[in-house]
Amino acid sequence: MRAVFGCAIAVVGIAGSVVAGPADIHLVAAKQSYGFAVASVLPTRGQVVGVAHPVVVTFSAPITNPANRHAAERAVEVKSTPAMTGKFEWLDNDVVQWVPDRFWPAHSTVELSVGSLSSDFKTGPAVVGVASISQHTFTVSIDGVEEGPPPPLPAPHHRVHFGEDGVMPASMGRPEYPTPVGSYTVLSKERSVIMDSSSVGIPVDDPDGYRLSVDYAVRITSRGLYVHSAPWALPALGLENVSHGCISLSREDAEWYYNAVDIGDPVIVQE
């Protein structure tokens, strides 16, 4: 097995990734006084999410007229301490999200309303992952303190970056399949997922093709960019980039991160 397995599955729309989950029955409504029927709002009532989670409103019918979209946006109110600014993004004709300009305060409650409907959600600890393409590392901080899994015994002193708090040896995309630089939000967590290169145009029987089951997969884009376990890439972790774009970790590090991170926590990829 070559150490270049990547990280693609069937393409799905970002709205589907973000909005997946049970509808909050307190927010399912018929036509409201402001004129638009709301199907669901995320996060759901009482849900604990990461500090970068957007507020996502799904309407029961498409809204395409610019004036109507502005009216729908004005009906969305978000209250937090301290007060937050943000921007609206339409993911589809019936889905709009409000993205805060900075991270929500950790361990806090956010109140939101859409017209006459109201709800609230909570944020957990600020679990921030930073992938460095040039340093071949994935560094995780929790509430501003760099943390990571305890080393196994006997401690692997030969491991790259051993003893550096929160720093995990990683491997990102090789030159042909670079990991895109940018800021992302955790969309979902999958204990095991099938990754298939044909979903990104690489036949499975191609020399670069693959189809395999991957553990501890944390999805950060709708097109299949993940932080995940990659035991086949152990010799490259911390030393070189060999994946098809995903952030590859050891099984132990991937399991720890999978258990620590919430949906909505940020992942930052930098050179």
From Swiss-Prot:
<keyword id="KW-0573">Peptidoglycan synthesis</keyword>
<comment type="pathway">
    <text>Cell wall biogenesis; peptidoglycan biosynthesis.</text>
</comment>
<dbReference type="GO" id="GO:0018104">
    <property type="term" value="P:peptidoglycan-protein cross-linking"/>
</dbReference>
<feature type="domain" description="L,D-TPase catalytic">
    <location>
        <begin position="127"/>
        <end position="270"/>
    </location>
</feature>
<protein>
    <recommendedName>
        <fullName>Probable L,D-transpeptidase 3</fullName>
        <ecNumber>2.3.2.-</ecNumber>
    </recommendedName>
</protein>
<comment type="function">
    <text>Probable L,D-transpeptidase that may perform as-yet-unknown cross-linking reactions in M.tuberculosis. Is not able to generate 3-&gt;3 cross-links in peptidoglycan, using tetrapeptide stems as acyl donor substrates. May function in the anchoring of proteins to peptidoglycan.</text>
</comment>
<dbReference type="GO" id="GO:0008360">
    <property type="term" value="P:regulation of cell shape"/>
</dbReference>
<dbReference type="InterPro" id="IPR038063">
    <property type="entry name" value="Transpep_catalytic_dom"/>
</dbReference>
<keyword id="KW-0133">Cell shape</keyword>
<feature type="active site" description="Proton donor/acceptor">
    <location>
        <position position="228"/>
    </location>
</feature>
<keyword id="KW-0808">Transferase</keyword>
<keyword id="KW-0012">Acyltransferase</keyword>
<dbReference type="InterPro" id="IPR050979">
    <property type="entry name" value="LD-transpeptidase"/>
</dbReference>
<dbReference type="Pfam" id="PF03734">
    <property type="entry name" value="YkuD"/>
</dbReference>
<dbReference type="InterPro" id="IPR041280">
    <property type="entry name" value="Big_10"/>
</dbReference>
<feature type="site" description="Covalently binds to acetyl group of faropenem">
    <location>
        <position position="246"/>
    </location>
</feature>
<dbReference type="GO" id="GO:0016746">
    <property type="term" value="F:acyltransferase activity"/>
</dbReference>
<feature type="active site" description="Nucleophile">
    <location>
        <position position="246"/>
    </location>
</feature>
<dbReference type="InterPro" id="IPR005490">
    <property type="entry name" value="LD_TPept_cat_dom"/>
</dbReference>
<dbReference type="GO" id="GO:0071972">
    <property type="term" value="F:peptidoglycan L,D-transpeptidase activity"/>
</dbReference>
<dbReference type="GO" id="GO:0071555">
    <property type="term" value="P:cell wall organization"/>
</dbReference>
<dbReference type="Pfam" id="PF17964">
    <property type="entry name" value="Big_10"/>
</dbReference>
<keyword id="KW-0961">Cell wall biogenesis/degradation</keyword>
